[in-house]
Amino acid sequence: RLARLYPAMPETAAIWARADAMLVPEKVAGELAYLQRPGAAGFERPYGWAWLLALHEELARHDGPWAAAVEPLARAFAARFHAFLPKLTYPIRVGTHFNISFALTLAHRWAKAHDPALHAQIEARARDWFFDDRDCQAWEPGGDEFLSPALAEALLMSRVLDRDAFAAWFAAFLPRAAQGQPGTL
């Protein structure tokens, strides 16, 4: 993304060279083989899955062959999301790699462009899990957390709801945000 946004920066040539070396069908085939080994169904779920979809979405904005090379891996992770989301009874709200809101935020844009069924599934699950959330307690951050579960949820809902619906949802979810409360956020 940096190379796309700032093509004149000194590091751009090195970024393109690294992409040319790494984002090739042979290397993706190795990743797919690793992913398909027995017992790997949950490998990197959901954080790694989502980051790969975000990477593929960015690569699709470039003229190079990288998006086509990475697409089989993106499709494999999308298939895993399709299978996983209906099984997840409750959202995973921790502030770590397992946070489902953060993962779905990353996957949402990719799904909108590349997999309408997954896009609809992400939006439906987000509404199912979070639409009725009110007066968030925001007992965070935890000692081992690097994400704010509350803010990750809010970011996802900002992508799923239209502007007016999100404003109403956010006002109910964090009703004292304008006063800087909860202070941990």
Which residues are covered by each model-predicted region?
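Extended ligand-binding groove/face enriched in aromatic
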Residues: L2-A107
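Short acidic alpha-helical/loop segments enriched in Asp/Glu that coordinate divalent cations
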Residues: Q121, P141-D144, D162-L174
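Non-catalytic carbohydrate-binding regions of carbohydrate-active enzymes
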Residues: D135, F170-L185
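Loop-centered beta-sheet repeat module
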Residues: R80-L151
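Alpha-helical solenoid scaffolds that mediate protein-protein interactions
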Residues: L2, A19, L59, A126-W129, ...
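Carbohydrate-active enzyme catalytic cores, enriched for enzymes
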Residues: K27-E31, P149-E153, M157, R163
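Alpha-helix capping/termination and helix-coil
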Residues: F130-D133, S158-A165, A177
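Positions within ordered alpha-helical repeat solenoids
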Residues: R4, E58-R61, R109-A113, D128, ...
